[in-house]
Amino acid sequence: MKTHNIIDFLRRMAFGGALLAAAVLLPACDDDPAVPDEELTTDPGTSVQPETLRFINYNILEGMKLDKGQNFDNFVEWVKEKDPDFMALCECNKFTEKSLTALANRYGHSYAVLCKETGYPVGLTSKYPIELRNRLLEDVPLWHGAIHARIKDINVVVLHLYPFGTYPNGQGAAGTGDAYRDREINCILDSTIRRYPVEPLWLMSGDFNSYSPKDADAMPAGTYYETHSTVLRSGYFDALRDRHSQFFRSVPTLYNLENGSAPRRIDFIYASQGMMREITDSRIIYDEFTANYSDHYPVMIEFRHYPSGK
């Protein structure tokens, strides 16, 4: 081979090698940083898809007494319309667990539990099996009692805190009812989320008969907030106010508006961090039924739930 041909051949080989090296260094199209990694790696055939669940907390005023004369027909139709997957109830007066289950069956819930069958009990109804973990009654100083249950892999705590301004049996001065509620909430927290800190999914709801610092923008100066501050320090988030800057009242309704009570929020759904990040909607339900059949408005949330217990 002639000398100039050899030189030309070597030059072409060097140029081709440079092109090959450049091609190796260039990113592939599939590695475009604008495309999220999960879109590249997720297998639609095996990925876990969440279900959407709805939960309502409702104080039904002494066993839904305003609809008892109609055999609870209006209440049943309302629940069917809202279609919660499970529902916490305060003031299930005069219900037994058997009769509450029968009522729940009418609106599509096959399961129900009641904390007791006297006084002002709390209850829980569900489309899905309820694992009752504890009835909080005489073993802790709770005025109305509480329920700790599990639905799917979600811990659900239903409570109704002490309703009066002074200690039971007239003990103590005005305002000491706050101290009793503080005692109740600490007993409930000690028996539930503090006792099982490694369990990530918690909802705690009910009539707290007390005020949250989250509502300080709508409350008078000097309002007592410690009951809810204790809850917030225990790993719970306010499902309503942590998603909305606006104040919403849960009392009074039209039923008792003439009493002259100022708008207040005493009905809450609290969520642990693992639950809070999956909530897609939270609201107080204002409609014709809720305005006229109880002295409290119900609270509702919707959330994503991963069957694997994500």
Where are the language model's segments positioned?
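N-terminal, active-site-proximal structural segment of metallo-dependent hydrolase catalytic domains
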Residues: 2, 25-103, 307-310
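Bacterial N-terminal signal peptides that target proteins for export
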Residues: 2-17
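Active-site beta-strand/loop signature of hydrolases that rely on acidic residues for catalysis
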Residues: 53-60, 78-97, 156, 181-218, ...
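Acidic/histidine-rich helix-loop elements
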Residues: 57-73, 162-180
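Structured beta-strand-rich core segments of catalytic domains in phosphoester-bond hydrolases
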Residues: 86-166
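Active site of divalent-metal-dependent phosphoester/diester hydrolases
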Residues: 110-124, 210-278, 285-291
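Active-site beta-strand termini and strand-to-loop segments that position acidic
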Residues: 125-127, 148-153, 272-273, 294, ...
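Short helix-loop capping/hinge motifs at secondary-structure junctions, enriched
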Residues: 129-134, 275-279, 308-309
